[in-house]
């Protein structure tokens, strides 16, 4: 059955990468194939934590999409877009850097999917006002979100999985990974001009933006206050996850329910931002990856890679980092990390007498988080961003994303390798 699972996954992946077939249709067809053959059962799909649909991701997306849909009715995105454009004096590069910094910071405190859902509408409005292409801005922001999410325990789902298995705390992530994330973020900003080239804006467009009054963009101040109060509660619950142990998906759904109750909006108004295609694509992708996990393909690949190290902790850390990045770029990093954590735990236990035994855990988290930038389906935030871009009339192809993402991933992993080497194997001794 492993051959069948691999064949279906590779065929689906090739079709998705070709950009010639609707990716949601491909994902659902591939999912149907692994069920019919049968490689995976309905119980595996709906109830298994390891091989099933990640309902936490699905419901987090639904909740945050509804919250964004309600928030859009207030005009706050227009306000933020005008404010950002005016503070940057209409310079596309300065606007991009500002939005990149906001995306990275927000992803460290929330999660990168939520960040993309909140920042993307602002980006679309800024680009519309200046009459410039949105694709460069959206890609830069999702790169920053995946990088920023590595900084904290709650920033990226793989970090939560690693922390749970390794017994690491919120403060551990802040102490060990945040310094590297700052370095990688600076490197990302430095390569932005080379990555996306120069973006020109017509002078009259800049003059028009500078003449705008952002205060006039707010259409419903009462609803904005209600949204602000709910968002504060939602964000606080996200940050307090290590203490409250309330799943982010439940928090998002509760927040969405509260806003629906107090907003007075119609069903079509608050559901207008729900990306149904994106949700179905995720479901299909989770099912196909679940088939790879169930048949032992991912486990066999990971075990073969880690056995090459011969028990040396330095080699183990670098191999985990190097293997995690490309694999996380090909399959979603959540099921990959869920599969790898038992193996890393076993390796750490065997090497217990060696110094820096937590380093393989940091290598796994960094490889999975940074590797998410490699391809368009490497991280949940990427898929969400592509869906938003498509609906906005500015679709981003799989290969366009991958060409840029490969550069960002290579720089990030190179800096991560240097950081791990210096901090844990040179300066520590």
From Swiss-Prot:
The keyword Transport applies. PANTHER family: P PROTEIN. This is Uncharacterized transporter MT2758. It comes from the Bacteria. It comes from Mycobacterium tuberculosis (strain CDC 1551 / Oshkosh). GO terms for cellular component: plasma membrane. GO terms for molecular function: arsenite transmembrane transporter activity. Keywords: Cell membrane, Membrane, Transmembrane, Transmembrane helix, Transport. InterPro entries: Arsenical_pump_ArsB (IPR000802), Cit_transptr-like_dom (IPR004680), Diverse_Ion_Transporter (IPR051475). The chain crosses the membrane at residues 26-46, 51-71, 99-119, 135-155, 173-193, 223-243, 278-298, 311-331, 361-381, 407-427. It is a multi-pass membrane protein. Belongs to the CitM (TC 2.A.11) transporter family. It is found in: Cell membrane.
């Amino acid at each position: 059955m492993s051959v069948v699972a691999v064949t279906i996954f590779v065929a689906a992946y090739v079709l998705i990468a070709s950009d010639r077939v609707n990716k949601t249709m491909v994902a659902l067809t591939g999912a149907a194939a692994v069920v019919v053959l049968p490689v995976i059962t309905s119980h595996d799909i709906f109830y298994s934590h390891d091989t099933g649909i990640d309902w936490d991701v699905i419901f987090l997306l639904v909740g945050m999409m509804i919250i964004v849909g309600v928030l859009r009715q207030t005009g706050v995105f227009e306000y933020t877009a005008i404010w950002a454009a005016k503070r940057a004096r209409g310079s596309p590069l300065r606007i991009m850097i500002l939005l990149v910094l906001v995306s990275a910071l927000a992803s460290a405190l929330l999660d990168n999917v939520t960040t993309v859902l909140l920042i993307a509408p602002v980006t679309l409005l800024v680009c519309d006002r200046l009459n410039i292409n949105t694709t460069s801005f959206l890609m830069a922001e999702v790169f920053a979100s995946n990088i920023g999410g590595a900084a904290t325990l709650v920033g990226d789902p793989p970090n939560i999985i690693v922390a749970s298995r390794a017994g690491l705390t919120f403060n551990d992530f802040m102490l060990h990974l945040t310094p590297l994330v700052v370095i990688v973020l600076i490197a990302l900003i430095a390569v932005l001009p080379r990555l996306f080239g120069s973006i020109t804006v017509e002078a009259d467009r800049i003059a028009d933006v500078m003449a705008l009054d952002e205060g006039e963009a707010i259409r419903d101040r009462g609803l904005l206050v209600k949204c602000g109060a709910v968002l504060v509660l939602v964000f606080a619950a996200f940050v307090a996850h290590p203490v409250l142990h309330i799943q982010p998906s439940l928090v998002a759904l509760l927040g969405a329910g509260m806003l629906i109750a107090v907003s007075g909006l119609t069903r079509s108004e608050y559901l207008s931002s729900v990306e149904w295609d994106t949700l179905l694509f995720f479901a299909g992708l989770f099912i196909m990856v679940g088939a790879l996990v169930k048949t032992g393909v991912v486990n066999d690949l990971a075990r073969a890679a880690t056995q090459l190290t011969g028990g040396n902790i330095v080699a183990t850390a670098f191999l985990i980092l190097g293997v995690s990045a490309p694999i996380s770029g090909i399959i979603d990093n959540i099921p990959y990390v869920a599969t790898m954590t038992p193996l890393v735990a076993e390796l750490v236990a065997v090497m217990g007498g060696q110094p820096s035994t937590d380093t393989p855990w940091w290598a796994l988290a960094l490889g999975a988080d940074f590797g998410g930038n490699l391809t368009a389906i490497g991280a949940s935030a990427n898929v969400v961003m592509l869906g938003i871009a498509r609906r906005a009339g500015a679709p981003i192809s799989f290969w366009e994303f991958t060409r840029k993402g490969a550069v960002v991933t290579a720089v990030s992993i190179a800096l991560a390798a240097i950081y791990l080497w210096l901090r844990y194997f040179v300066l520590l001794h």
